[in-house]
Amino acid sequence: MSAPAASPALGAPLVEHVLARYRERTVAELLRHIPEQSPPYLYDLAADYPTRPCKGLRGALCLATCAAFGGRSERALNPAVTVELFHNAFLVHDDIQDGSELRRGAPTLPARYGVEVALNVGNAINLLGLRRVMANRRGLGGELAWRLFEETELMCRQSLEGQALEIGWIRDNACELTATDYYRMCLKKTSWYTFLYPCRSGLLVAEGAGADATRLDRFGWYLGAAFQIQDDVLNLTGAAEEYGKEIAGDLWEGKRTLMLIHLLERATPAERARVVRHLSLTRAQRGPGAAAEVAWLLDRMAAYDCVASAREAAAGLVAAAGREVGAVLAGAPEPPDEEAAQALAFLAALPDFVVARGR
């Protein structure tokens, strides 16, 4: 079949509709598998992040990919729950590592309950994700369950390696990074578990254990990098109410975003030394003048068009993702029903949605 055209005017409402429908199904199934009785501060808190307002992108992508390539989406519901559980566990641990104060419009688990409680909850959510991986054997058969386990192990390994890169750059005050370094981190930290893993899981459920699960990898890589850049841009420019996280938190935390790399490349020697000095200090070490330094960094990024350059890079990646997904969808089977047709249109429209979103 020919790839469905993605109209910008119709794309965003369609994407939001599909996200909402699949999120409702995924969250309901996820909550069914969280134990109701436990010691306090464990499973009760494991349900916190998944039930806060969010897109549910990863689970929806798994379900939509399955439907688009001839599968029944209900067979992919357990893998969709799996990716959402691992995602929320990563978020809890991210909030600990970053010292973040807000997540999805409310205090983070470490901010509200302390690091010790949050760390244990994150571990519990990972365990719940592992239990869902195990459940694939009963629901999908041993061969397909093993393929999904292999994909899960690969996703976790790549994500942890990406997180190690980012944490290491902050710890070592790395200030000689290039855009290539940033994209490598994006591929590992963001692309794998946000796009490649859900797409691969959906393809395997649709076509079986012998399927080529890599067909959407280039789409996932390009879109994952664009997604991360847009997330970084929103961190500096987003509306606090819609974004749901601390504005300019990346500058407080010293994260090496594409915009920060551009600033380090474009600043005068004196400005660059000031940036490096700011980055060398932890948030706790910066003292009462830190807010003024963050404001100065924002001003310098504006002066050197760092945000505009990042947006331009994201637009190029989105265009590449659109070409890749169009080529793959051209080989998809004719949609047998409305859900499959919407799933195909969802995948085609997703690239433009990624850079238009406000959270």
Where does each model-flagged region fall?
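N-terminal amphipathic/basic leader segments beginning at the initiator methionine
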Residues: 1-34
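Hydrophobic packing residues in well-ordered alpha-helices of helical domains and bundles
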Residues: 15, 19, 23, 76-82, ...
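Generic structural signal for well-ordered, non-membrane alpha-helical segments
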Residues: 15, 19-23, 54, 58, ...
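Mg2+-dependent prenyl diphosphate-binding active-site environment of isoprenoid biosynthetic enzymes
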Residues: 35-272, 352
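Surface-exposed helix-capping loop/turn segments at secondary-structure junctions
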Residues: 139, 209, 325-339
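Hydrophobic, well-ordered secondary-structure elements that form the walls
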Residues: 260, 321, 347
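Mobile late-domain/C-terminal helix-loop "cap" segments
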Residues: 273-328, 332
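Short, amphipathic C-terminal "tail helix"
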Residues: 332-359
